[in-house]
Amino acid sequence: VKFRQLGDSQIGVSEISLGSWLTYGGGVGQEQTEACTRAAFDAGINFFDTANVYGGGAAETVWGEVLKGFDRGSYVLATKVFFPMSETDRGLSREQIHKQIDASLRRLQTDYVDLYQCHRPDPETPIEETMEALTEVCEAGKAREIGFSEWTVEQIEAGLEVPNARKFVSSQPQYNMIWRAPEAELIPFCEQHGISQIVWSPLAQGVLTGKYAPGKPPPEDSRAASAEMNWAMDRY
């Protein structure tokens, strides 16, 4: 496994990361999560990405149990904030960012995350408030760096222009050989500003592995065969 720097930061990450959407804390239990995590470590992967909303917090909880068995300095841990955790807990306000980072750290059983990401933009909160809150999280030692997922170039630019705010080091768009829209504007803009790409769905939920055939049922041991997880396949 090769390694790269995460944007303009000092964080070195493996080119391949292990994510947890649709799996850990949902259709995949702790025993299998631990097996996957150990296999990732054995392969040289040091980058693990999750989000508070995955499994309603369950993905972070399961990984917290699994990762506490590894030296904290041996891996890079990323999580996210934005989507609803309850009817009233959502968004990127100062209150929510501080509340949700603390909740994520408790579930993950760690004092800090290496990367804290805005899971989506929040049009209801001034960008200045969001960026200031993210900066406060970093200054408090609860996150080393910040990033975003699925922001437009205009939204990224607005965040970068907030005075004295922490700068983004990562972008997480959907990007794979089927969906290449980020190549038009997002990736070139990020390259100019020292922002790395951490893509989600790089294998299009497994479609690009070749294990799913048109008109045939999915393999029994695949996520697409699970009633808990096959809804994500509808887009393909």
Please identify what each model-predicted range represents.
Residues 20-31, 81-98, 119-125:
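Active-site mouth loops of central-metabolism enzymes
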Residues 6, 18, 33, 40, ...:
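Conserved, mostly hydrophobic/aromatic
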Residues 11-16, 44-46, 71-75, 109-114, ...:
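Short, well-ordered coil/turn segments that N-cap beta-strands
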Residues 25-28, 51-60, 84-85, 122-126, ...:
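Acidic-and-aromatic substrate-binding clefts and catalytic sites of carbohydrate-active enzymes
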